[in-house]
Amino acid sequence: AFKEKNIPLSQKVYSLPGADFSDISNKYDTIIVGSDQVWRPKYTGGIEKYFLSFADNRIKKIAYSASFGTDKNEYSFYEKWVCGKLIKRFDAISVREESAISLIREQLHWDVDVIQTLDPTMLLDITDYKSLVGQVVNNNKIFVYILDSSVQKISFVEKLEKVLCMPGFTITPKGMDNKSA
């Protein structure tokens, strides 16, 4: 409901995983990629597509505030090689984190021009966020999003549930653990 109400979307072009991207090059003259964790192979599956492997050379390719979500190289030798070739086809590259610039240059050894840009969530005005806060529904549950799950993080959430006497609703990239359903 949040996404439908607050994030206007264009017509859906494709869906991952296993999507066929072959017709996209015929429809667009510019493709922009960028998001949290978008260049993190651990979470994307088929990382080459996020480096626009499907786009032919006439397409302008832009990375806007792309994120690796880590300062460590998680690329296999093959992914590093393939994505290193693909990133050189970009017309402009910006990343969210300063550590991403170091990752690109010092660990992945990709020789490309890259700049750091502001996280897009910081582009909103405070009034945009205030309007969202007014829509919050209190249902006496703890919502938890854990990106990199660990025993310590799960243990912390369980302790928090006990202290607050509220059930937790936890979502992770690998699926959903809805203990309160």
Segments predicted by a language model, with ranges:
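Aromatic- and Gly/Pro-rich donor/ligand-binding loops
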Residues: 1-85, 155
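Nucleotide-sugar donor-binding and catalytic loop/hinge architecture
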Residues: 24-27, 55-58, 128-141
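Alpha-helix capping/helix-boundary segments
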Residues: 38, 99-100
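Catalytic donor nucleotide-activated moiety binding site of glycosyltransferases and closely related
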Residues: 63-70, 101-104, 146, 153-181
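Acidic anion/phosphate-binding donor-loop and adjacent secondary structure
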Residues: 72-77, 122-135
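A short beta-strand/loop micro-motif in the catalytic core of glycosyltransferases
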Residues: 90-97
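Helix-loop-beta element that forms the nucleotide-linked donor phosphate-binding surface
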Residues: 101-121
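Donor nucleotide-activated moiety binding/catalytic core segment of transferases
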Residues: 114-121, 126, 176-181
